[in-house]
């Protein structure tokens, strides 16, 4: 059983600064970290490894220079995966969901897999598209919002999803792509033994050419800025008579 768990390196939001002059966001001092939602996918994959005989977990990511960071690679491997594959290319530096999904699908095909796990979204964009797009590109079943994995066999994965008014149980034929929610587990903090052992695990570094990836047309990012601050008018209407109600309705109409 070959399980791939996908993750994304994102800027640490605590270190993102706002430029007061134009509201643009400054990422220059923000270190890269594993997207918080992907920690749940990594944990879920490693828990499955304990259930499936001879299962192997491969962590997979596509991106830019952030993936060259040795500390970041060690952090991923210390959380349980057996190996790491990173696809590094300048074109993935600010990749949007379609481009990311296309590259992940190509890399997964090259690596081989029975099951792909993703987080529900990334901490930076949170588009919630990549997992489903990977399934569509590979033409295999894809399910998102999974809150519990019930069982795994050689050819079927059984999961639960918490819907608005009910709990849905699904049996998914493998190979498949599953995007897990944050309800599925609480990611463990790696032990010192796991951190030291991570340095001995294999890491494969691929380029876009290695996975046969051709760039796809994508929207280019022009600017990322914080929303402009608006001064509140602080209009207080006192009383409950008809005049006050009419004034309240008139003020509502102005902002709708």
UniProtKB/Swiss-Prot annotation:
PROSITE patterns: ETF_BETA
Top-level lineage group: Bacteria
InterPro entries per the UniProt record, alphabetical: ET-Flavoprotein_bsu_CS (IPR000049), ETF_a/b_N (IPR014730), ETF_b (IPR012255), ETF_beta_N (IPR033948), FixA (IPR023463), Rossmann-like_a/b/a_fold (IPR014729)
UniProt KW keywords: Electron transport, Transport
Any matching Pfam family: ETF
Pathway connected to this protein: Amine and polyamine metabolism; carnitine metabolism
An annotated GO BP: carnitine metabolic process
Any one Gene Ontology molecular-function term assigned to this protein's record: electron transfer activity
NCBIfam families: PRK03359.1
Free-text function comment from the UniProt entry: Required for anaerobic carnitine reduction. May bring reductant to CaiA.
The protein's assembly and partners: Heterodimer of FixA and FixB.
UniProt family annotation: Belongs to the ETF beta-subunit/FixA family.
Protein name: Protein FixA
Species this chain originates from: Escherichia coli (strain 55989 / EAEC)
Lineage start: Bacteria, Pseudomonadati, Pseudomonadota, Gammaproteobacteria, Enterobacterales
Gene from which the chain derives: fixA
């Amino acid at each position: 059983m070959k399980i791939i768990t996908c993750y994304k390196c994102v800027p640490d939001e605590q270190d993102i600064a706002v430029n007061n002059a134009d509201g643009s966001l400054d990422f220059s001092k923000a270190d890269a970290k594993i997207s918080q939602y992907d920690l749940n996918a990594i944990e879920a994959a490693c828990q499955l490894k304990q259930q499936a005989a001879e299962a192997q977990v491969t962590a997979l990511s596509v991106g830019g220079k952030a993936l060259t960071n040795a500390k970041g690679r060690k952090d991923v491997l210390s959380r349980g995966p057996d190996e790491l594959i990173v696809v590094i290319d300048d074109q993935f530096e600010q990749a949007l969901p379609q481009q990311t999904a296309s590259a992940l699908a190509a890399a997964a095909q090259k690596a081989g897999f029975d099951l792909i796990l993703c987080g529900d979204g990334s901490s930076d964009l949170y588009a919630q598209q990549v997992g489903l797009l990977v399934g569509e590109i590979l033409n295999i079943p894809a399910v998102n919002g999974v809150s519990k994995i019930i069982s795994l066999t050689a050819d079927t994965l059984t999961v639960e999803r918490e819907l608005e008014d009910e709990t849905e149980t699904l049996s998914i034929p493998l190979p498949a792509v599953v995007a897990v929610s944050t309800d599925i587990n609480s990611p463990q903090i790696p032990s010192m033994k796991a951190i030291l052992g991570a340095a001995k695990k294999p890491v494969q570094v691929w380029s876009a050419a290695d996975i046969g990836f051709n760039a796809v047309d994508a929207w280019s990012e022009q600017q990322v800025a914080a929303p402009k601050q608006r001064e509140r008018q602080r209009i207080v209407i006192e009383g409950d008579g008809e005049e006050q109600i009419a004034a309240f309705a008139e003020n509502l109409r102005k902002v709708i």
